[in-house]
A protein has these predicted regions:
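Conserved RNase H-like, two-metal-ion catalytic cores of nucleic-acid enzymes
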Residues: 4-144
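A generic structural-conservation signal
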Residues: 112, 163-164
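Mixed-charge, glycine-rich, non-catalytic linkers/tails in nucleic-acid processing enzymes
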Residues: 120, 162, 168-204
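Amphipathic alpha-helical transducer elements in NTP-driven molecular machines
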Residues: 144-151, 183-186
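Glycine-rich, acidic and aromatic/proline-enriched surface loops and short helix-turn segments
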Residues: 155-160
């Protein structure tokens, strides 16, 4: 009984967070600057991970900015840009990217709203597994059916996420291939965000 109540409470909190995000999306003025971002790092949260790069894409004009270890476009400059953004959009940014930035930069205090496409994916497509089995997206491995990962959405949207790190990729060392992978992640997220905005009309 106790376990059931805990599970129900957790589901209720998740649903509340999802609906709050929907309300946030509906209140966004059209002139606000939407920044889609992704980052790559050496590892997981609470493991002393180091950020290798941050890629930002302006959804209004599709311009892309890269912040890495160059003096003129450093990671800390990228962090400051994120703080100034009106709206931050990304896949799993609530669960990973933003906490990782705060872990490394404790003073990080974004002023804008954070919208997580992973949360929206679970809200708008709770039965995505059924859809996958019916449509069978081209080239999509069956292990990704029903998943809300960015890799899975890449197949559904025909905007394939890269495979850096699955074979020879080394996350401990920054490389051009890693940067390309991060840039492609923002491309997939941009298309996913466009889909989520269309789906949001069903909740209006």
């Amino acid at each position: 009984m106790t376990e059931t109540l805990i599970q129900f409470s957790s589901q209720k909190r998740t649903r509340s967070r999802q609906m709050n995000m929907i309300q946030t999306m509906q209140q966004i003025p059209s002139m606000n600057k939407e920044i889609i971002f992704d980052l790559e790092s050496t590892g997981l949260l609470r493991q002393g991970s180091r950020i290798h790069c941050i890629v930002m894409r302006d959804s209004n004009d599709d311009s892309t900015s890269v912040f890495d270890h160059r003096p003129e476009q450093s990671i800390i400059q990228g962090v400051k840009e994120l703080e100034r953004a009106d709206i931050l959009i990304g896949h799993n940014i609530i669960g990973y990217d933003i906490p990782l930035i705060k872990e490394q930069y404790p003073d990080f205090n974004p002023q804008g709203q954070a919208i997580d496409t992973l949360v929206l994916s679970r809200l708008f497509y709770p039965h995505i597994d059924t859809r996958d089995y019916e449509r069978r997206p081209d080239g999509m491995p069956q292990r990704l059916y029903g998943r809300h990962s960015l890799e899975a959405w890449g197949y559904r949207l025909k905007c394939f996420k890269g495979d850096f790190g699955k074979h020879e990729g080394n996350w401990s060392v920054y490389s051009p291939e890693m940067l390309d992978y991060c840039i492609q992640d923002t491309e997939v997220t941009l298309k996913l965000w466009a889909l989520m905005k269309r789906r949001m009309k069903d909740y209006s």
